[in-house]
Amino acid sequence: MAKSNNVYVVNGEEKVSTLAEVAKVLGVSRVSKKDVEEGKYDVVVEEAAVSLADTEEVVEEVVTEEEDILEGVEVVEDEEEEEAAEDVEEPTSEEDSEDEWEEGYPVATEVEEDEDEEIEYPEVGDFEDEKAIKKYIKGLTDEQLQAWCELEGAEWVENEHRNINRMRMAMAIKAVHFPELAKKPSSKKKSKYAEYTTEELVEMAIDNNVEVRDDKGNERILRMYTIIALREAGLIS
């Protein structure tokens, strides 16, 4: 039976009915309506009545081919939050907070070395454990951390948000020095709709006069809504 209240589809697959449940699924302390509207998280609001039973299978299949796009939007998992909590120390005053801290990360207030002087970065085997490398990373600027990653050949997916990008660089360089700590890639089931591009699905809907819900400019949401509409019209199985 369809529900009349809003349903939040989190990460394209898990459906919950409240923002508190959305935050719990994402592993963050709080998610506001504004966060959802601005697209800060991968959350889709089902505004109209939609049969959850009909949608569940589609969302589950569609999300498998889209998950690579979301790499690291598992960026604030419990493990990373705990690490951030350990690493960040509160500044001693409001003035210190403005001058020496930026979005939870310490920034250098004085240039202790010549900017042109090349840093001699540690090599693999120089750190005793993960705690030691984490302490070393804390003392690097974003530019120095990036240079170290590039020097070591560490790979990460860049993100426009500074904190997320820094976290990914830190995880990438730690994986080089401690490969046993790196997360193993999970095997993913290929969606049976992978053979269709989003454009082909949309064209199929247009050719058959199938109405597709407003995607609000998000291509992944457009793809999901188009597949749902085509399934309901009996054009794909």
Curated annotation (Swiss-Prot):
Residues 73-105 are annotated as: Disordered. Residues 73-103 have a biased composition (Acidic residues). Hypothesized to function in the shutoff of host biosyntheses. But it seems dispensable both for host shutoff and for phage multiplication. Its shutoff function is probably not entirely specific to host activities. This is E3 protein. It comes from Bacillus phage SP01 (Bacteriophage SP01). The gene is 44.
